[in-house]
């Protein structure tokens, strides 16, 4: 699902207030990282991810793989931080960052 510019704008404003819920280090996308990514996307829909890799090309490749494996959309990537979104068909209004910060 491709995000519209209006959605990206809204998600960026919400993402500004978020802290990273997932940190991907040198080991890349391990089973544990993928399991936590699935849990975070199911709970929060919009999450901030920190990529602890030095090289820009490595971060970009890892981010592309992360989005492909989780079937999510990249909203924004700045430096070592990325904002990732995947719609949950039945979001929990208390956990979903989209529902919680909709008024921002």
Swiss-Prot record:
Output the PROSITE patterns linked to this UniProt entry.
Answer: CRM
Q: Name one Pfam family in it.
A: CRS1_YhbY
Entry-linked Gene3D superfamilies: YhbY-like
Q: Which SUPFAM superfamilies match?
A: YhbY-like (SSF75471)
| InterPro entries in alphabetical order | RNA-binding_CRM, RNA-binding_domain, RNA-binding_YhbY, YhbY-like_sf
All copies of the CRM domain together span: 1-97
**Which superkingdom does the taxonomy of this entry point to?**
Bacteria
GO MF terms listed in the record are: RNA binding
Which keywords appear in this protein's UniProt record, sorted alphabetically? RNA-binding
Q: What is this protein called?
A: Probable RNA-binding protein PA4753
């Amino acid at each position: 699902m491709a995000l519209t510019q209006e959605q990206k704008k809204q998600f960026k404003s919400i993402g500004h207030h978020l802290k990273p819920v997932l940190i991907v280090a040198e080991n890349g996308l391990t089973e544990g990282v993928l399991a936590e990514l699935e849990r975070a996307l199911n709970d929060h829909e919009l999450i901030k991810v920190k990529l602890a890799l030095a090289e820009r090309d490595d971060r970009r490749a890892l981010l592309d793989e992360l989005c492909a494996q989780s079937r999510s959309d990249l909203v924004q990537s700045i430096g070592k931080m990325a904002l990732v979104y995947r719609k949950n068909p039945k979001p929990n209004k208390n956990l979903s960052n989209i529902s919680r910060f909709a008024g921002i």
